[in-house]
């Protein structure tokens, strides 16, 4: 039974840094620091990595 507690604590420590990578981009400053640009639709060689806080304004980054 003690192995369950060890396994749970190991997984908790192992997976806790993943929350830092799943934070959404939702303002222009974060978009720029992540290497993106605030633009309307992401076209051509760009992909959407978040939003810039306004409706229809997306944070786009080159593919």
Curated annotation (Swiss-Prot):
Q: Name one GO biological process term.
A: chemotaxis
Q: Which GO terms describe its molecular function?
A: CCR6 chemokine receptor binding; chemoattractant activity; phosphatidylinositol-4,5-bisphosphate binding
Parts of the chain that traverse the membrane: none
Q: Which UniProt keywords apply?
A: Antibiotic, Antimicrobial, Defensin, Disulfide bond, Pyrrolidone carboxylic acid, Secreted, Signal
Its function, per the record, reads:
Exhibits antimicrobial activity against Gram-negative bacteria and Gram-positive bacteria. May act as a ligand for C-C chemokine receptor CCR6. Binds to CCR6 and induces chemotactic activity of CCR6-expressing cells.
**Does the entry feature the keyword Secreted, yes or no?**
yes
Q: Which InterPro entries match?
A: Defensin_beta-like
Q: Which family does it belong to?
A: Belongs to the beta-defensin family.
The molecule here is called Beta-defensin 4
Natural source organism = Rattus norvegicus (Rat)
| Signal peptide location | 1-22
A Gene Ontology cellular-component term: extracellular space
Which taxonomic lineage is given here? Answer: Eukaryota, Metazoa, Chordata, Craniata, Vertebrata
Which positions form S-S bridges?
A: 31-59, 38-52, 42-60
Q: Which Gene3D superfamilies does the record match to this protein? A: Antimicrobial Peptide, Beta-defensin 2, Chain A
Record localization: Secreted
Q: What's a Pfam family this protein contains?
A: Defensin_beta
In which tissues has expression of this protein been reported?
A: Highly expressed in lung.
**Domain of life assignment:** Eukaryota
Q: Which residues carry this modification: Pyrrolidone carboxylic acid?
A: 23
Q: What is its main location?
A: secreted
């Amino acid at each position: 039974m003690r192995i369950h507690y060890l396994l749970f604590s190991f997984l908790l420590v192992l997976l806790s840094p993943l929350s830092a990578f799943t934070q959404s981009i939702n303002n222009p400053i974060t978009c720029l620091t992540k290497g993106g640009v605030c633009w309307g639709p992401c076209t051509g060689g760009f992909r959407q990595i978040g939003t810039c806080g306004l409706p229809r304004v997306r944070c786009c980054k080159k593919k």
